[in-house]
């Protein structure tokens, strides 16, 4: 393996926000392949996110976005552990991106666990009826229903949605990457999306 250049370490750091040593290690582990190194850092960020998941998040910001036409607005609660992180450029950028995501993708809730039970039951029944009408056996129909429910989560659950600026990553991936970089637990709390002329 060739030596990792300082330029490639800097490029990876600029792209991910991870520390210099983490970037160098990621490039070393991935034989200098930047895309694989980004994935490696994401995985590392995920493990950091899991370690920090139980820590209290009593600080944060209310991220907001108002569309340029003034007819669509979003407010979202983004929580972290310290006011130092809450004021950081990276955290504020994340809050802005999440608010823009909500404006564009109109999620129903943050996590799959928050999907209203009546909505989920109704959708499962529709998916099952569709599968049965397609002539699928009961056991296969259930697997089809599970697959369609996962697809539904990607449409209506904020953390499962593909990021509007890069559909290769989800909002959950983005949040876990932020946790890996800042070293604190981050949570998305409540959100409100208002569009002129839409019923609440």
Curated annotation (Swiss-Prot):
Gene3D superfamilies for this protein: 1.10.286.20, DNA helicase RuvA subunit, C-terminal domain (1.10.8.10), Elongation factor Ts, dimerisation domain (3.30.479.20)
InterPro entries the UniProt entry points to: EF-Ts_dimer_sf (IPR036402), Transl_elong_EFTs/EF1B (IPR001816), Transl_elong_EFTs/EF1B_dimer (IPR014039), Transl_elong_Ts_CS (IPR018101), UBA-like_sf (IPR009060)
Region annotation (Involved in Mg(2+) ion dislocation from EF-Tu) ranges: 82-85
Keyword entries, A-Z: Cytoplasm, Elongation factor, Protein biosynthesis
GO CC annotations, alphabetized: cytoplasm
A Pfam family of this chain: EF_TS
Chief subcellular location: cytoplasm
Compartment(s): Cytoplasm
Gene Ontology MF annotations: translation elongation factor activity
PROSITE patterns in the record: EF_TS_1, EF_TS_2
CDD domains in the cross-refs: UBA_EF-Ts (cd14275)
Sequence similarity: Belongs to the EF-Ts family.
Function: Associates with the EF-Tu.GDP complex and induces the exchange of GDP to GTP. It remains bound to the aminoacyl-tRNA.EF-Tu.GTP complex up to the GTP hydrolysis stage on the ribosome.
HAMAP family: EF_Ts (MF_00050)
Name by which UniProt lists this protein: Elongation factor Ts
Species assigned in the record: Solidesulfovibrio magneticus (strain ATCC 700980 / DSM 13731 / RS-1)
């Amino acid at each position: 393996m060739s030596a990792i250049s300082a330029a490639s370490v800097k490029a990876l750091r600029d792209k991910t926000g991870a520390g210099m040593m983490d970037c160098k290690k990621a490039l070393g582990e991935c034989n200098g392949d930047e895309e694989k190194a980004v994935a490696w850092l994401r995985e590392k960020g995920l493990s950091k996110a899991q370690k920090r998941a139980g820590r209290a998040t009593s600080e944060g910001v209310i991220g907001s976005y108002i569309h340029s036409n003034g007819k669509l607005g979003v407010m979202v609660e983004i929580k972290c552990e310290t006011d130092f992180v809450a004021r950081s450029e990276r955290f504020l950028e994340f809050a802005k991106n999440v608010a823009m995501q909500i404006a564009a993708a109109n999620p129903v809730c943050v996590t799959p666990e928050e999907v209203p039970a009546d909505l989920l039951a109704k959708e499962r029944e529709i998916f099952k009826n569709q599968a049965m009408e397609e002539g699928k056996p009961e056991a296969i129909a259930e697997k089809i229903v599970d697959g369609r429910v996962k697809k539904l989560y990607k449409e209506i659950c904020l953390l499962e949605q593909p990021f509007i600026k890069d559909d290769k990553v989800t909002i959950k991936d983005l949040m876990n990457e932020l946790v890996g970089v800042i070293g604190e637990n981050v949570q998305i709390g409540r959100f409100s999306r208002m569009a002129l002329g839409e019923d609440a």
